């Protein structure tokens, strides 16, 4: 784990995502003194996510970005697992939103599938795998999750993706209804990232 100590002195980090919501969340979790870059700053195309797990896909994205930019690159692969749908959409969460990334389409699809099963309040969880890739090819993956249940109709406008239908365990509001500060404190993304902070004390 000693190689990741270089993160402590990192001045530039590429957040390898084209999802504005994910970029903002990761940026808010990371130290403020670092200059952050997006894939479009380097005209990077999205690599093909051929992995079978969240960790595998996160690694594909971070490795691709680090290799082509020479910067420490952080990527995440996350998704919603719905128990009543055998943990689908899972790693296909973004694809369910279609090429335009319209999550209203994905949410409607989940609603229709659950309605047929009479399981609209199915238990579910958000899973996030974060991968850190160094310019020497080393990668490190961490995973976090938050349990909860689904709620229809969608509620709230503060989140993105499936946030409007996900109620974290112990809460009565959806991710899209609670504040960014509160969401960042309990989110699957934060739980994955906090594992990096255990090893690397950002100053």
Predicted regions and their residues:
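Anionic-ligand binding patches
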Residues: 2-16, 20-203
């Amino acid at each position: 784990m000693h190689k990741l100590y270089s993160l402590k002195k990192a001045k530039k980090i590429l957040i390898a995502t084209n999802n504005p919501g994910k970029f903002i969340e990761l940026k808010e979790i990371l130290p403020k003194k670092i200059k952050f870059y997006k894939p479009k700053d380097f005209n990077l195309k999205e690599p093909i996510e051929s992995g079978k797990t969240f960790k595998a896909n996160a690694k594909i994205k971070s490795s691709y970005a680090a290799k082509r930019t020479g910067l420490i690159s952080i990527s995440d692969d996350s998704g919603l697992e719905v128990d009543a749908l055998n943990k689908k959409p899972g790693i296909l969460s973004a694809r369910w939103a279609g090429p335009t990334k319209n999550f209203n389409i994905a949410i409607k699809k989940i609603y229709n599938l659950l309605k047929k099963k009479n399981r609209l309040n199915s238990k579910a969880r958000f899973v996030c795998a974060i991968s850190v890739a160094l310019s020497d090819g080393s990668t490190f993956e961490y995973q976090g999750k938050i349990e909860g249940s689904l709620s229809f109709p969608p509620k709230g406008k503060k989140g993105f993706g499936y946030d409007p239908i996900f109620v974290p365990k112990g809460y009565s509001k959806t991710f899209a209804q609670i504040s960014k500060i509160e969401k960042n404190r309990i989110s699957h993304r934060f739980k994955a990232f906090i594992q990096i902070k255990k090893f690397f004390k950002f100053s």
